Amino acid sequence: MDIFGSGEHRPRVLFICTANVDRSRTAEDLYADDPRYEVKSCGVAPFATIVVTRDLLEWADHIFVMNESEDHHVTALRRRFPGLSKEVVDLDIEDRWKRGHPELVRRIIARLEPHIGKPKAKPATAPKA
C-alpha cells in the first residue's frame, strides 16, 4: 500500500515527543482532519499525557519522533521496546515552543512534508436544505 492510502485502510501515523503536550500534540492537531491518515500522539516519559505503548507502536504504519539529539526519543523507544522493527523517523524538532506556536507548526509541516505531505483538511459538507 502506498503512503497516500490507496489500500483498504488509511495509513496510521503516530507522533511521539517527551510529554505528549506540545510537539506531538501539535502534529496530531495539524493532521487530525486530514482524510488521508488516521493520527495519534503520545510521549516517551512516564508522566506523558498518553504514554507510548507496544499497542500504539503496532497500530502505527508510520512513526515520527520529535527529537533524538536532545530528547533521545528513538533511543527510549528501542530501549523500552527492544523488538521494535518499524522505521522510526526523527524530525529533529527541539522542545522550544508551546502547542500550536506558529514556528512549531511551520517546522512540523516542513519536516513532515517529504514523508506524508502537507496537512489537508476534510472537505466541508454542504448544509442540508
Regions of interest found by a model, annotated:
Residues 1-62, 72, 109-126:
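Conserved active-site segments centered on acidic
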Residues 56-93:
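Mid-chain, well-packed structural core segment of small domains
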Residues 78-129:
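Phosphate-binding/catalytic loops
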